[in-house]
Amino acid sequence: MSCNRFFLIGLLVLGSITSGAKPNFVIILSDDMGYSDIGCFGGEIQTPNLDSLAKDGLRFSQFYNAARCCPTRASLLSGLYQHQAGIGLMTGDKKLPGYQGELGRNILTIAEALGLAGYQNYMSGKWHVTKHTRPEGPKENWPRQRGFDRFYGTITGAGSFYDPATLCRDNTYITPANDSDYQPETYYYTDAISDNAVRFLKDHEMSDAEKPFFLYLAYTTAHWPMHALPRDIKKYQGMYDGGFDPIRKARLKKLKAMGLVSSDTKLSPGSDNWEKTPHKEWEIRNMETYAAMVDNMDQGIGRVIKELRNQDKFKDTLFLYLQDNGGCAEGYGRYAAKNGYREDQPMEPDELQKKIWPPMQTRDGRPLRVGPGEMAGPEDTFIGYGRGWANVSNTPFREYKHFAHEGGIATPLIAHWTKGIAKKMRGKIDHQPGHLIDLMATF
């Protein structure tokens, strides 16, 4: 079966575009989220905008990624398997074919291909397909050199949501403080990704409205650290007080009712026993914060949708939402800091944040707080939500990010395109397997 038959069947694209007009494309990629986190895939987290896209679009129940950040992005951007694209693992060079840790220069990215077809290409968010992350470069594998006309985001893969490492506008390192183009009252990276995407769309409408566009919206939600705004955390207070199992059972029941999994599907073995889990209040707060991060991302997706509706381009736009891997069981920040851990010095507001892994102090000199009892959410914390909640995120599957089990590689896929999906197909679920390499072939 050809690699694009999957979408030609599912989306019923042929014959749906009048007058040969080219559709716009929006790919939304979230980070370190599980199969059943969002509402339209069984989750209790409030994601009304993604749910709306699913209601009037298509859901794919057996779509697969590459289990890690970099390989998934390399495959998505190239339409190739990750080893063919040069990033079989992460961005370290293993001195082996397929493991160069760098997006191959002999491949055409989706943005480069669409540019040749007359598209304007925009990216907001996480890049993570090059080992060259320093401000001095080399930059031949940065977004602007791989087909994107404008870029706002981070070159590397993780960091504070209040002070992102490797933050750039186009080819220039910036900080939240010295970026004259974007000065919100409170800087939060997920909001910044959404807001800059909306700005790109506004500017496109003013200067290039006659051209189709491709927007790659690559969130770092919900990669550790668990950073979220208080107003979003408040929505989820009390929701997770019962621990892991009640949420897993409720999600599986909803997945079955929706028809996303078969009626005889069983839960995978639980990874942690809630009754024996210490620091329950801390664990609850970690998941409340995680849910708040996802909620905030959905709010931003809503702003993108609203802008396209205002421009009367929503119906002409194909939206695809998916995730880079499963929920993450890594234990980052879940243990108390050792002596000598906080060794960095405070930074000036406009001093470039070059450190890939987090500094041990905030810019204003507050020590970073990690370990049990340090409640997630604020800027001066740096905590992962842990194995127990990752098991919840990946309901009903076993294992996590990193693994080639369903818990590591199964992703929701939502496709929405008012002019391209027949009315009789809207709201339906497609159970045919698909993979990242199918996306570029479809475009």
Regions picked out by a protein language model, each given a short descriptive name:
Residues S2, I17-F443:
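Formylglycine-dependent sulfatase
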